[in-house]
């Protein structure tokens, strides 16, 4: 089973054996911490590779240069931000308002060889400069755009969304101007990757 997972990651995302071992360590840390602060649901923890690693790493398909700054909003358990960092993104900013989750992020960030900054604060309190914003399971699109209006985003937003994506886009367009593209998620038929450029 693990060999098949490694082969998939290696073929599709050039994941080395060393990086794969870091993902295994990630799972161990997450399992340990999850019993006390509920970072992810027990069901998705059982499906760690597809639900969390594959779901996060697929964003690399839409990131064409690893020497960038990615700001990950509401990082929680570190998906997708920490996964992208372990996979080689040079600079990742993890923004998490819950201090217990920020403490977990501080520990799991040590698995990465790249630069990770953890900010324990609310998104709307910050002025962040980055190339790409990533978001997974945080808030509706209108809220995300409202909370980041003071950010300087050079390239785009990459947002993992579920089946209500079209309603969220329609609502957000009432108060915001942006161009968007939709890409099918490789992990769930009802999930999408929403790419937004403002």
UniProtKB/Swiss-Prot annotation:
Swiss-Prot/TrEMBL catalytic activity: guanosine(527) in 16S rRNA + S-adenosyl-L-methionine = N(7)-methylguanosine(527) in 16S rRNA + S-adenosyl-L-homocysteine
Binding site for S-adenosyl-L-methionine: 74, 79, 123-124, 136
EC identifiers of the protein: 2.1.1.170
Main location: cytoplasm
Subcellular location: Cytoplasm
Keywords: Cytoplasm, Methyltransferase, rRNA processing, S-adenosyl-L-methionine, Transferase
Protein name: Ribosomal RNA small subunit methyltransferase G
Organism: Orientia tsutsugamushi (strain Ikeda)
Lineage: Bacteria, Pseudomonadati, Pseudomonadota, Alphaproteobacteria, Rickettsiales
């Amino acid at each position: 089973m693990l060999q098949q997972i490694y082969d998939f990651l290696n073929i599709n995302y050039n994941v080395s054996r060393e990086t794969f071992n870091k993902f295994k360590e990630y799972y161990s840390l997450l399992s340990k911490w999850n019993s006390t602060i509920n970072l992810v649901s027990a069901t998705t923890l059982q499906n760690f590779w597809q639900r969390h690693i594959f779901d996060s790493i697929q964003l690399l398909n839409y990131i064409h240069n690893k020497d960038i700054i990615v700001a990950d909003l509401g990082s929680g358990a570190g998906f997708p931000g920490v996964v992208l960092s372990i996979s080689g993104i040079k600079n990742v900013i993890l923004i998490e308002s819950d201090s217990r989750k920020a403490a977990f992020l501080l520990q799991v960030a040590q698995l990465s060889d790249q630069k990770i900054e953890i900010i324990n604060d609310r998104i709307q309190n910050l002025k962040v400069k980055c190339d790409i914003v990533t978001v997974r399971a945080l808030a509706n699109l209108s809220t995300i755009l409202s909370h980041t209006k003071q950010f300087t985003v050079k390239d785009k937003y990459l947002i993992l969304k579920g089946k209500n994506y079209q309603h969220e886009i329609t609502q957000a367009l009432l108060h915001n101007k942006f161009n968007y593209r939709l890409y099918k998620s490789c992990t769930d038929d009802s999930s999408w990757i929403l790419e937004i450029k403002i």
